A protein has these predicted regions:
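Non-catalytic, soluble scaffold/interaction modules
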Residues: 1-170
């Protein structure tokens, strides 16, 4: 499976984990066979996006970029078309085949010409490191009240007190 994440604006908010992006899963064998291969989509909340500042804002603040809220209408639709997703997946297959291993690929869609561009590719580390290790499965024995929702960053079940971190200095 090729796993693709996408959000609006510059990719830094996705990389930093500051935004919950859209997620797309593309089936490699179906894609290689020339068939429609998008097998699952998850709509992310995409609350914010990072954008370039105007020349006036740059002159006033000295900043090249800023973070702004994404309008509700945009949040409620996918940030990529199915055709874009499958094109990115085809690029991923070519890159993976060239390097002979799974790759973590950063891409961008130009806001002016609408074209997809590959920005960088590096060996994928998280999933490939897991190969050969025993897989542990966890099962919840019950369900409690949902206090907060977000994007999972791990695959285990945790318990204990919640600590809210307001800044990097904490």
């Amino acid at each position: 499976v090729v796993f693709i994440t996408a959000s609006y604006g510059l990719g830094e908010t996705v990389v930093q984990g500051a935004v919950n992006p859209d997620e797309f899963y593309v089936h490699k064998p179906m894609l290689r066979a020339g068939n429609r291969a998008l097998i699952r989509r998850n709509l992310g909340s995409k609350l914010i996006e990072m954008v370039f500042t105007s020349p006036q804002e740059k002159a006033e603040t000295g900043k090249l970029v800023k973070t702004v809220e994404v309008p509700t209408e945009q949040r409620n639709r996918f940030s990529l078309t199915d055709a874009d997703v499958e094109q990115l997946a085809r690029y991923a297959l070519v890159i993976e085949e060239h390097y002979g291993r799974p790759m973590d690929i950063e891409w961008g869609k130009d806001g002016v010409d609408g074209q997809l561009y590959i920005l960088q590719a590096r060996p994928e580390t998280v999933k490939s490191q897991a190969q050969g290790k025993a897989e542990l499965r966890y099962k919840l024995k019950g369900r409690g009240t949902v206090l907060a929702e977000g994007r999972a960053i791990g695959q285990k079940i945790g318990t204990g007190p919640v600590r809210r971190v307001h800044s990097l200095s904490e």
